[in-house]
């Protein structure tokens, strides 16, 4: 059983090292993880940093121009040979050194085509945390406004071979399109694990470009939902986790992130 972790980056010299360290220090890295990095021909020191680690660890990487983040992610899919794929892009990092191993039994069963967990979103300016959790069985109303966090979603490689990859004519919304198709249209087998997989730093284009997000979301909502689905959506309410649960998860996140930061500083 092999998990391919794919990191897409461009001009991320201040963020890429933390991401790499969270992967290569996984307790099962040597046995069960294939690491693939797709660099978009960075003009800063990103490629140099990647090479430093690729000289020490078995990292498969390329540095070449791409036409956007989803083009780069599709390149990562093609280069990967794992049974399951996880996208952990520059700046994001796995929550602790044993998180992949903790899911080994689920991966080895091969029962599910998609496995999704929770993630923590952190604002780098305020250091405030928000819980990113999803329903155990997300339905069409969920995908109308939200999506699965790719930093905490494992896709069977054969899913991409069967249904295709990310649509490359969008900048932000292709995650939403893919996940909606897989779970609502194609009804792939899926499993939610109620544990935190990763930390997502909210400073990427999807977090900061509200105008573009709104424009693409309108296209998505107009073109990827049937009239019947729209009726279902209007008839439902999205239930969010309780404030008490969110508060507890934020506290746990702070502790785990401090541990991860200490491990990175001490080379563990």
Residues covered by each model-derived region:
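Conserved donor NDP-sugar-binding/catalytic core segment of glycosyltransferases
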Residues: 97-129
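Acidic donor-binding/catalytic loop of UDP-sugar-dependent glycosyltransferases
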Residues: 45, 71, 92-106
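Short, well-formed alpha-helical segments that are part of the catalytic scaffolds
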Residues: 12-26
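Conserved nucleotide-sugar donor-binding catalytic segment
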Residues: 131-220
């Amino acid at each position: 059983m092999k998990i391919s972790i794919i990191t897409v980056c461009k001009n991320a010299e201040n963020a890429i090292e933390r991401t790499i360290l969270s992967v290569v220090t996984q307790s099962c890295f040597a046995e069960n993880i294939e690491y693939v990095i797709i660099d978009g021909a960075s003009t800063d020191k990103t490629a140099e940093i990647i090479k430093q680690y690729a000289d020490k660890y078995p990292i498969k990487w390329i540095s070449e121009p791409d036409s956007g983040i989803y083009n780069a992610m599709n390149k990562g899919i093609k280069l990967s040979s794992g049974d399951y794929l996880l996208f952990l892009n520059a700046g994001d990092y796995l929550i602790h050194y044993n998180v992949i191993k903790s899911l080994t039994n689920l991966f080895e069963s091969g029962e599910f085509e998609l496995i999704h967990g929770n993630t923590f979103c952190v604002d780098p300016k305020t250091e405030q945390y928000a819980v990113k959790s999803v329903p155990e069985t997300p339905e069409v109303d969920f995908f109308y406004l939200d999506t699965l966090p790719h930093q905490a979603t494992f896709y069977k490689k054969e899913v991409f071979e069967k249904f295709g990859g990310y649509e490359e004519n969008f900048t932000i919304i292709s995650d939403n399109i893919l996940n909606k198709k897989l779970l609502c249209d194609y009804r792939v087998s899926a499993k939610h694990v109620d544990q935190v997989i990763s930390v997502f730093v909210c400073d990427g284009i999807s977090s900061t470009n509200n105008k573009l997000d709104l424009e693409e979301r309108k296209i998505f909502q107009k073109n990827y939902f049937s009239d019947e689905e729209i009726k279902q959506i209007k008839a439902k309410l999205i239930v969010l986790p309780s404030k008490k649960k969110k508060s507890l998860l934020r506290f746990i996140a702070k502790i785990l992130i401090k541990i991860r930061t200490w491990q990175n500083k001490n080379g563990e």
